[in-house]
Amino acid sequence: MSEQNPTQAAKQAPQQELNDIMAQRLAKLDAMREKGQAFPNDFRRENISDDLHARYDDKTKEELEELAVEVSIAGRMMMRRIMGKASFATIQDMGGRIQLYVTRDKLPESFYNTEFKKWDLGDIIGAKGVLFKTQTNELSIKVSEIRILTKALRPLPDKFHGLSDTEACYRQRYLDLIANDNSRKTFLLRNKIVNAIRQYLNDRDFMEVETPMLQSIPGGAAAKPFETYHNALSLPMYLRIAPELNLKRLVVGGFERVFEINRSFRNEGVSTRHNPEFTMIEFYQAYADYIDLMNLTEEMLRSIAENVLGSSIVNYGDQVFDFGAAFIRMTMKESVLQYNEGIEASELESMASLKALAARFNVNIKENWGEGKVLTEIFEETTEHKLLQPTFITAYPAEVSPLARRNDQDPSVTDRFEFFVGGRELANGFSELNDSQDQAERFMDQVAQKESGDDEAMFYDADYITALEHGLPPTAGEGIGIDRLVMLFTDSHTIRDVLLFPHMRPQAK
């Protein structure tokens, strides 16, 4: 008989321990089945832990005794201390945690020893009782009735010491949410941020709409789409890269203030800031321009910081961002000059000098690029990462802004802005191009770029041109990356930390 490899034995030991634990729990479940319904659904919870803490944490022992507050609560048992005839147990629900005080004498005869003490951490239980304060002044529930509602067959991660394997947190988010308070708080805060954005726009008479995820022509952004096929229509289709063109069709139709919070898809790389499937908000307002939207964005983000985070000062790692101060505003050229030494304004005015500047800063450019694209690439490589405090960058070249309105004083640039914090782009907005002939010409330029090998160039959308020919009122629109905004406001340094189910490579079998 061959000896077992030590490494193999080390790998098998935890699995064997897990198998033993699950076998014990399965036996307990079988015993529950023999006694009746093992998964009851007749317990009704009436209270949530965080609400109880908010209402009664400041009460004294005497006040709680006088109030005699009866509660009904349910959640997952996370900790338990058995002390003879009495036990303390901590349960976790959607609001947080609260302690139960369970005594043998308050329960049916033999229940404490034959039932309660045999339950396991991770089991979901329901309890009723009266609030009181312990000797250490902790708000707790003196239990008069307790039941097991769901038997957990698998143990909690590392016996409740937490789930520290980052990849496991992403692959098994349900375990991460059970074991890690910070993850729970991040996603609860994400929900509050999205609700705050929605409420802000609702209060200003914006209408929330839904537009198709499947499109026959992807548009609204420069990105490579995911391709699919519609069998019933025998039609190649794409997952949308942005909802922009459909939202502007709605403005043509008379819905003058619209927004959508939903997913978009771009078949591009994965990084700490990029996920192929991501959430964004786009909103459009008729009879407004890009300056109006800069003002709205500044006010909205300041409001979210103050009302959701409780402060206009946002801490991100070792950086501090001030959303209470006026946001910085400057043109792309101004920012390149301000944040880079040794560059003269004249160097940004011709193709020859821009190419020389790109070579000096080791910025890679392509021969078919125009001045605007080269300038934008120089900005992105030399300046963007230096925009730390909340900053609007304006005057984007028309060459890189195929859907934006040209500036009246300088038609080579557009009435467009991008918003940066911590060196990262969070938003992109502009006065919309509503000249159908100009838009058709820019679409043709995009088609030429696509034919020359640019996978991210836009398609020609004839129906959108037809919509513009019916008349799009003067309009401004904007898109904000929800995931990146949540990263900033929750001090999260990878996008996977703010996505409940981030994309992962399949595990090797």
Swiss-Prot record:
Q: Where is this region: Disordered?
A: 1-20
> Which free-text remark accompanies the cofactor?
Binds 3 Mg(2+) ions per subunit.
Q: Which cofactor names does the annotation list?
A: Mg(2+)
Compartments (UniProt record)? Cytoplasm
PROSITE patterns reported for this sequence: AA_TRNA_LIGASE_II
- Enumerate the Pfam families for this protein: tRNA-synt_2 (PF00152), tRNA_anti-codon (PF01336)
Which keywords has UniProt assigned to this entry? Aminoacyl-tRNA synthetase, ATP-binding, Cytoplasm, Ligase, Magnesium, Metal-binding, Nucleotide-binding, Protein biosynthesis
In this chain, Mg(2+) 2 is annotated as bound at E425
Q: Quickly give the catalysed reaction.
A: tRNA(Lys) + L-lysine + ATP = L-lysyl-tRNA(Lys) + AMP + diphosphate
Biased region (Polar residues) positions are 1-18
Q: How does it assemble?
A: Homodimer.
Q: What is this protein called?
A: Lysine--tRNA ligase
**Species lineage:** Bacteria, Pseudomonadati, Pseudomonadota, Gammaproteobacteria, Alteromonadales
